[in-house]
Amino acid sequence: MLAAHARLLPPSLALAPSLQNEQRLASHILGVTSPDNWHSSFLRAIAPAVDDVCATGSAALIELQARTKDADPDGLLAALDLAQTGKEVLPVCRRLLRLPMTRGRAASTMARSMSIAPDGRQLLSHQPEAHLDGLQELLKGAAYKALVDYQELVSQGGRGAQSKQITPDATVHPLTSSTMHLLRRLMEFQPTVDWLLATKPQLLAAGSTREYARGVLRDHVHSLQSRAAHHVKDKCRAAVPHLFLLNNLHYITSNIRTGFNDQPTAARLQQFVGDDLLRVWVHSSEVNKETYFAKSWDQLLTFLDDPVERLQEQRGSKLLTLESGRVLKAKFEGFNNLLTQLHVVFCQCSVPDQGLRAQLVDEAASKVAPKFSRFYAQFSTVPFSKKNQAKYLRYTPDDVERLLRDAYGGVTVAQVASPEHADDDSDDDEIS
């Protein structure tokens, strides 16, 4: 909350009950017993509070303009908070200024009695109602501009070069978390946002808070997809943009469904966003998960097809022919190299949601580890390399299982590979 906004509340909250208890205030607190002087004394007493509202409201507006220049969600929420307070408080001030004048007192005299304190200090401008009206319009304008600026920020995907980039570790983008935070808080300001959208010029297509929130979320998801589509990637990193989308879409859909771990909020969020958008994003999340696996861990399975029909032994011997030995070498070497590359890539990636991370790890392990174990058991004892059998048997089934399960945990390949399986770079094309 803005500091100036905090200062605005005490005097403003005192105005409404003061208005309701004008006679008691004038009679018992101010010592005025004549009904003819009730209004005059009352208005003179509350003039400092009205003046304080105007002064602190103006100060809050200056502070707000500085805070909302970067279109951050906290600045937008502060603008809505202040506009909502102005919507509630300033009409009370205006009503106070419109109280009927007492008999026998000229309007000009009454205005002077309100605008000058006993110590001679100027309290209100010569046109206090115009001051209040102008302040309310400025507060409304600042809040409306903050709504427009944030929607533009989201539609552009952020600012500068980063607006076209995915996060380096494929994690949830900061704009995703801030937009979801804004969505949750927008529900609290729904009457105020509806009021702003109904009374300001239609720079925004949305006619309600719900339409605005849905539009911002749609624009943000589109910008995420655009980032992923334009991400420069090599073969081993082809799955990273899909992990990025999966992380972000999962964050959006799971928090809409759970309401940030609050069931009443979840029900309101789902109604606010709508089942139509939620279904689309859940489906997109599943598609990106499938594509992520197809371009990463599933590629390992291509090296584990059973090559028995293609293997031939040398005549009169159980040793493999040169060509058959090369078949097994290519399979083990291809698997080892790709596993190493994928592990290096995904050690640098992050999956912040523990449930999603466990799901991805378990699925990769269940697909690859059993098939590699069978392949290893069947062919690791076959002498397909004269000098460098250990080079091709670099990873044991336990190593592979560990690599798959530590893929997002920052464990290096050197820490996992068995020491006795160190590489030997010498050539070995002959089996004898």
Where do the protein language model's features map onto the residues?
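Long alpha-helical rod scaffolds of large eukaryotic non-enzymatic complex subunits
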Residues: 1-432
